[in-house]
Amino acid sequence: MKEIFYDWGGANVWLFHAINNIRFEWLDNVMLFGTYLGGHTFFPFYLVILTLIALFAVNRPAQDFSSYETRVKRWMAVIAVFSFAYWLDGILLGTLKPLLDFPRPPLALPLETVNIIGATELHHSLPSGHSSFAMMVVASLWPVLTRWLRVAGVCFVLWVGLSRISLGAHFPADVLAGFILSLAVVLLVYVAIQQLMQLMRKEHAT
């Protein structure tokens, strides 16, 4: 199973080297910054910024009260999804990483074949926490993003994911697993919150 879903018949390692071997000093700095922005420690900062944007957005003039109410509920749902998805994603990552304990590239491959930029990490490769967090941020905000902001969001997610490979911290399969895990978490939390809001509306109506 591992050979199919993780090794990809050798493509996982091949793709890692194809990305990790692209070396320019300016590119290293770009990738380091991408990893920096994709760190879970940025959650409080992103939450504050999101809350300020939500306050600004809901206080814009509305055509009628119904439009205003819809806008408020949409932003409340986004903030709730963002917060609960972060919490659930953290629990899953904290469980899966040590449980699976996949080796990172510097441990799984001959060390001289891996370009490492930044700290050397050896264990808990699957899934990528940075990639998961980046996907969680963008997927949570997706309902309130404009078309161009969605494009920017996708670019951000790919940037963070590629940075983990470029810096020698993860294999492509780790990054993809992080994306899938976080997207599934956001969708699950979104559906749960929508169901809860519908239930609250029904109770309020009665």
PLM regions: where:
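Membrane-helix interface segments
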Residues: W26-L27, R71-W75, L145-A152
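Membrane-interface elements of multi-pass transporters and channels
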Residues: I22, W26, F56-N59, P98-P103, ...
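Membrane-embedded catalytic cores of phosphoryl/pyrophosphoryl-handling enzymes
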Residues: V114-T206
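Alpha-helical transmembrane segments of integral membrane proteins
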Residues: F33, T41-F45, A77, R147-C155, ...
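Hydrophobic, aromatic-rich transmembrane alpha-helices
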Residues: P44-R60, A134-W142
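N-terminal transmembrane-helix/juxtamembrane module of multi-pass inner/ER membrane proteins
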Residues: M1-Y46, L93-E121
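Membrane-interface loops
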Residues: F65-P143, M200
